[in-house]
Swiss-Prot record:
Family stated for the protein in its record: Belongs to the class-II aminoacyl-tRNA synthetase family.
E.C. designation(s): 6.1.1.6
Pfam families hit by this protein: tRNA-synt_2 (PF00152), tRNA_anti-codon (PF01336)
Protein name stated in the entry: Lysine--tRNA ligase
Gene from which the chain derives: lysS
Annotated Mg(2+) 1 binding sites: E422, E429
Organism whose genome encodes this protein: Chlorobaculum parvum (strain DSM 263 / NCIMB 8327) (Chlorobium vibrioforme subsp. thiosulfatophilum)
Biased composition (Basic and acidic residues): 1-10
Amino acid sequence: MSNAPEKKNQQNDPSPAVSLNDQMKRRFEERAHLAESGIEPYPYKFDVTATSKGIIERFDEENPEDVSVAGRIMAIRKMGKASFFHIQDSVGRIQIYLKRDEVGVDSYNTFKLLDIGDIVGVKGFSFRTKTGEISVHAKEFELLSKSLRPIPIAKEKEVDGEKVVYDAFADRELRYRQRYVDLIVNPEVRDTFIKRTKIVALMRNYFASNGWLEVETPILQPIYGGAAARPFTTHHNALDMQLYLRIANELYLKRLIVGGFDGVYEFAKDFRNEGIDRFHNPEFTQVELYVAYKDYVWMMELVEDLLHKACVEVNGKDSTMFLGNEINLKPPFRRLTIADSIKEYTGMEIRDKSEAQLRDIAKDLGLELDPKISSGKIIDEIFGEFVEPKLIQPTFITDYPEEMSPLAKKHRSEPGLVERFELIVGGKEVCNSFSELNDPVIQRERLEEQARLRQRGDDEAMIVDEDFLRALEYGMPPCAGLGIGIDRMVMLLTGEDSIRDVIFFPHMKPE
């Protein structure tokens, strides 16, 4: 072992004089030295019998537990005849005590070649150190994976009067581009994604417990629909036809309601060829639910119950912190029509106004509008600019103009409106729901009007889908539909302020 590569302070050297290339060169040399010494730097398996968290939770001073644990080295304190280091596994961290006289000189010298970031397996027993820390006293250890690239941004922390090197990773853009490093060095990031999984599992169980069927519908579609958005296009070579990545799965799920299912839902990847910001990613996750014989009023109550249960599951209480505000998700939520909301926050009355009058209202409010957009889009612009950001506590915005919602059923008592709601929380839309339009004649009229809007230049207007209309002509029962953006819901319940913080690998500009 005397010809081992020279190490700087026996760990990652944080000094600027040591470049990344120098550190990597040394690690490659260590890898080669290990292999030459007959030590496999990447063995095939290691039998794990315990986790860091389990060892700590089960610790009994009187009955030390024999354990076999594995993880990544996150801190090292090397001394002459004994060393301490911390390993991190999928559920936490635990300290390891390694003594030369117990593991043997050769093994101990091998340990001296290890770095922060290396993955090791340890066999030994649990004990408590003099400082009170539950640890593992190693009897054997094995290198499981040699890390050739140092974890970035070293920092020092004093432990028991000695300096210990830790690593951190703070640059947000680098964190998103190299999520694997982010997960290694920022445990709170891992916690966010664990919570995401719990939220989706709760929703899935909630829907299944009601007897509704989880289904799958096409991602590649010959006609896109179900939302107002620009699609991604692709080409099918064998069929020589243009296809679209779905922007929503609504129209296919409604076909299944026509087919006789009382309730269907799908956790779907949807794609919209639009901008990227804190609340939008071109590829996103959405769950859509359709339940026969129900309406949008019933769906509001379901949403209240579902969000409250998810909040309690993740946070252990009725509320969550989101964008600097404490959000109370205990039902009931406030309900407000879109017209009343605009009246309340701008003083302007939009009911029974012509397109020209709506343009004048927008102008008075200081909005500059695209001359091609129609009445529905004008109302949407006014709401989005002056109302939505002010709706912090959960609020159902209801009863939208017909033009804004071509797939929703006309309001049973308010001419010109439809039975639709959006839930706004923290100034952002979380979900969207309709009493679904099931009259095929009116649906055709609505989609043909959308086609006219496309001719006026609205490239987000929907396309006439003849097969969907044919399905409706067979008869679809009364139905309530719901779409929830999973990414935004996770942001809300975990307190994250960017959609990139709840998606493992968000889309980024090229480096």
